[in-house]
Amino acid sequence: MGQKINPIGLRLGINRTWDSRWYAGKNEYGRLLHEDVRIRELLHKELKQAAVARIVIERPHKKCRVTIHSARPGVVIGKKGADIDKLRKRVADITSSDVVINIVEIRKPELDATLVAESIAQQLERRVAFRRAMKRAVQSAMRLGAEGIRINCSGRLGGAEIARMEWYREGRVPLHTLRADVDYGVATAFTTFGTCGVKVWIFKGEILEHDPMAQDKRLAGDDNRPRRDAA
């Protein structure tokens, strides 16, 4: 079933963490969940040109900490921080907590599956040939160190009468291996012929127990799992 399930959801608690990290009482869970949805909708709408890949929401005591992962942090911050102050005020209108917004720069957007999918979708909307867009994205990812990448495009590709799916893959993408660091992204292209869906899987390598780089990606309190001895 690793072929069917969302690769990120399958690995939650193993080598990925949740995008919403907070605990709530019985009577507050629904309200906070709706706040998270509205905050994400607002930020994605306001930051369309900022290449936002991920929005993490944490709620320490009486605060709401929003971390925006963007490939173009200058667009988010604005001139002298004016834009981020406006965003903070608009987010504060949604939640009753004190809002803190942090920006994290994505230094290699070619290795982020969400940004790659959105880039291909934008090219399809500009009527770039889908095979050219897919091949360019694959070459860029492999050049920057990805161990494997797969891209699916489906819909009325090139304005064809009959919808179909085309895919391109290079390297290996082990969807069943839980220790594999597989990033997954989805985007939709709104063309004059209808909508086209874009899915991207990027394999960045395996995260092993003895790998010090894996410490940042593991959840706190997850040290009791059996360790794999180095060969």
Swiss-Prot record:
Q: Which InterPro entries does the record match to this protein?
A: KH_dom, KH_dom-like_a/b, KH_dom_type_2, KH_sf_prok-type, Ribosomal_S3_C_sf, Ribosomal_uS3_bac-typ, Ribosomal_uS3_C, Ribosomal_uS3_CS
**Keywords assigned:** Ribonucleoprotein, Ribosomal protein, RNA-binding, rRNA-binding
Q: Which GO biological-process labels does this protein carry?
A: translation
The Gene Ontology terms for molecular function here are: mRNA binding; rRNA binding; structural constituent of ribosome
Q: Which domain of life is it from?
A: Bacteria
Ranges for domain KH type-2 come to 39-107
Q: Which SUPFAM superfamilies match?
A: Prokaryotic type KH domain (KH-domain type II), Ribosomal protein S3 C-terminal domain
Q: List the record's Gene Ontology CC terms alphabetically.
A: cytosolic small ribosomal subunit
HAMAP family the UniProt entry points to: Ribosomal_uS3_B (MF_01309_B)
Its protein name is Small ribosomal subunit protein uS3
The record lists the organism as Nitrobacter hamburgensis (strain DSM 10229 / NCIMB 13809 / X14)
The coding gene here is: rpsC
